[in-house]
Amino acid sequence: MANRIMLNETSSHGAGAIKEIATEAKARAFKKAFVCSDPDLIKFGVTKKVTDILDENGLAYEIYSDIKANPTIENVQHGVEAFKKADADYIVAIGGGSSMDTSKAIGIIIANPEFEDVRSLEGVAPTTKPCVPIIAVPTTAGTAAEVTINYVITDVERKRKFVCVDPHDMPVIAVVDPDMMSSMPKGLTASTGMDALTHAIEGYTTKAAWEMTDMFHIKALEIIGKSLRSAVANEKEGREGMALGQYIAGMGFSNVGLGIAHSMAHTLGAVYDTPHGVACAMMLPIVMEYNADCTGEKYREIARALGVKGVDDMSVEEYRKAAVDAVQKLSVDVGIPTKLEALKEEDLQFLAESAHADACAPGNPKDASVEDLKELFRKLM
């Protein structure tokens, strides 16, 4: 099967990039925006940075704020009805993965109403029409949802998250402005940054990886490795580096998939409401150890990209350990816990079965059974 790369039609990067929103909307003759943003971003004036630009340019909009972390089926259903009432013709998604994922689901269902039950879009979605046009404006440096063909929805009733993979949901325009991320608190910067690191490592080692995506992932690792600590310290250079690094990781993994660190993180988020980036960060070193013997020399390049010295003189065992240790140290340095106190022995079977069924699991470089996944989860206890 041929390899493919799917990206935004247009992406703008750097401080002040949000000014391009008006330019892009006018160029496409958009008439009214459905601004999708969460209540906290509205409360702290982050959303206003974008709506001010729309106001200055005479562009109509309506704000929708029924967004929650780990968006649910109900959030999507409410959003679809709100979009219809707004009489909008495009979406401006402002926020982290939650706003982006909600926006994608809304846009897909509006364009493909036969899939009004979002559960029917799980896995590789069978839609036939492009999503309502989305201008994606990330406010976190991690999910890269602005440049991916994936979104994740929580099924509260069944205590699970499900992944929808659909080329039709790619935002037409991504506006990646580090100034939109400057208000992120330390903990959120750390967790979303570790999500980006997990994207880069899982995308680099997944079964579908190839030369072009390898290029993206290694460059992303180099940038994230030298930027995340300073971003958590709220240094401008670190913020700018993470804004770019997480986007580059998205350019890669969206086209080749991920692995069991993500499938397990999705399950932890659904059952315990663990923040996604925290769950990824806790699982990543554990999963890297499990995958090590199925990754060729890639851990040497991971270690090198993360700043480990002398990797060319290391044995296979040494550079594999060095890569895992570098990831673990970065995670600890930015304040991520290594254990999950909420995890219960009686939950392990359900967690493992859910992770095994997750859409990310087949891409893992090493096959993992339900029993394997139970043992990996147990290492968090």
Residue positions per predicted region:
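An N-terminal, well-structured beta->alpha segment
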Residues: M1-Y64
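Short glycine/serine/threonine-rich phosphate/pyrophosphate-binding segments
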Residues: I18-I21, K43-V46, I73-V76, S98-S103, ...
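N-terminal small/polar loop signature for handling phosphorylated ligands or for N-terminal nucleophile
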Residues: I42-F115, R229-R239
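Glycine/threonine-rich beta-strand-loop-alpha-helix active-site module
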Residues: E74-D179
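Carboxylate- and glycine-rich phosphate/diphosphate-binding segment that chelates Mg2+/Mn2+
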Residues: N150-V256
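Gly/Pro-rich interdomain helix-loop hinge
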Residues: V271-D347
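Short, amphipathic C-terminal "tail helix"
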Residues: E346-M381
